[in-house]
């Protein structure tokens, strides 16, 4: 439990606080409290274990816990398939989904996406890169401008990059990028999404909502960030599935 709590606490020292590490810490705290009060809980179970209401309640709680575990396993499997089961081999357009910019430089997560896009482009230099992301309230430049700057500094020719700088969500990333490609008269045979592996499944689900069938170019997430972002993505996928929103 202590190790689990540390795993979710570590990103907070880098000012990364989201539903993923908050839920993870909450589960660790719940487990710690159960361990602390295991003796009185056991005594309570002995005293009330044969009563009908207790049996119904305890079995319901255990059933919900089991359902949660199965759901987490299923979502993780789906996320892995979304990232690696649909990996592209020959996409002629790659859309790099934006992420936080620190000042004018990419955040850790955005740099990972850009490095994945660059690695793919070096093997497929005819591929057109679409960098998609608007300017957040705490960002000095748009995510698209930041990505364009990073990729051109690494040697990608400017004419192989299109900038979409209006979007504020994954859905807008895809919708505005599609409009930009149409404006440019580009009719790609295959479109791949460049984003972190945990985000590929939900991004492809949103793309399907927009009428696209896409493949993936997964960016690897640093190990110390995996628990926080994968747990957050479980919630994101459930939210999208149940409510149809991001």
Question: Model-derived features: where do they sit?
Answer:
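A transmembrane-helix-recognition feature enriched in membrane-embedded lipid enzymes
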Residues: 226-246
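A structural signal for short, hydrophobic/glycine-enriched beta-strand patches
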Residues: 74-232
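Structural signature of transmembrane alpha-helix termini at the membrane-water interface
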Residues: 10-13, 40, 70-77, 81, ...
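Internal/C-terminal transmembrane anchor helices
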Residues: 53-78
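Membrane-embedded alpha-helical segments of integral membrane proteins
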Residues: 1-46
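Low-complexity, intrinsically disordered/propeptide-like segments
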Residues: 25, 183, 245-246
């Amino acid at each position: 439990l202590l190790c689990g709590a540390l795993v979710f606490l570590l990103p907070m020292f880098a000012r990364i606080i989201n539903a993923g590490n908050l839920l993870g810490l909450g589960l660790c705290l719940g487990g710690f409290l159960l361990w602390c009060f295991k003796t009185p809980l056991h005594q309570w179970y002995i005293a009330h274990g044969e009563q009908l209401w207790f049996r119904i309640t305890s079995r319901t709680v255990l059933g919900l816990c089991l359902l949660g575990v199965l759901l987490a396993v299923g979502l993780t499997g789906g996320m892995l398939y979304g990232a690696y089961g649909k990996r592209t081999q020959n996409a002629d357009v790659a859309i790099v989904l934006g992420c936080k910019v620190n000042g004018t430089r990419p955040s850790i997560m955005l740099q990972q996406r850009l490095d994945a896009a660059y690695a793919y482009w070096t093997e497929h230099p005819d591929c057109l890169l679409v960098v998609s992301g608007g300017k957040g309230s705490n960002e000095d430049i748009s995510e698209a401008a930041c990505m364009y700057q990073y990729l051109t500094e690494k040697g990608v020719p400017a004419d192989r990059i299109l900038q979409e700088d209006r979007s504020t969500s994954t859905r807008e990333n895809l919708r505005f990028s599609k409009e930009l490609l149409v404006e440019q008269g580009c009719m790609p045979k295959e479109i791949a999404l460049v984003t972190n592996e945990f985000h590929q499944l939900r991004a492809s689900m949103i793309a399907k909502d927009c009428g696209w069938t896409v493949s993936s170019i997964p960016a690897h997430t640093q190990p110390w960030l995996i628990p926080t972002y994968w747990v957050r993505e479980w919630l994101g996928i459930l939210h999208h599935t149940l409510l149809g929103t991001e």
